């Protein structure tokens, strides 16, 4: 995969503090890791709850539960961010 691939992060809303909303705080680390590797990142909201999907070249290359991602941060210590980056790097 070229270093400057376009990665679409599709994410759903999740419950926190008794409310269900779209929140991007748990995506900060994932975005940071992908951008540091030279990828262009686009965020898209979807109707599904508790889900994150990474799309490269129209293919879903990685999916996880959004609540399992670390809140905030740079993503370097989050094992799910490392898995997602590996999936993007091996996509074709």
Swiss-Prot record:
InterPro entries, A to Z? UPF0728
Q: Which residues form a coiled coil?
A: none
Q: Which PANTHER family match?
A: UPF0728 PROTEIN C10ORF53
Q: Which family does it belong to?
A: Belongs to the UPF0728 family.
Q: This protein is called what?
A: UPF0728 protein
Q: Which organism is it from?
A: Branchiostoma floridae
């Amino acid at each position: 995969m070229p270093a400057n691939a376009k990665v679409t992060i599709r994410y759903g809303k999740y419950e926190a503090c008794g409310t269900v909303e779209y929140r991007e705080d748990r995506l900060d680390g994932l975005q940071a890791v992908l951008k540091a590797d030279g990828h262009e990142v686009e965020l898209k909201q979807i109707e599904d709850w508790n889900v994150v999907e990474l799309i490269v070249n129209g293919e879903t290359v990685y999916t996880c539960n959004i609540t399992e991602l670390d809140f905030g941060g740079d993503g370097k210590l989050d094992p799910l961010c490392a898995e997602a980056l590996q999936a993007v790097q091996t996509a074709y």
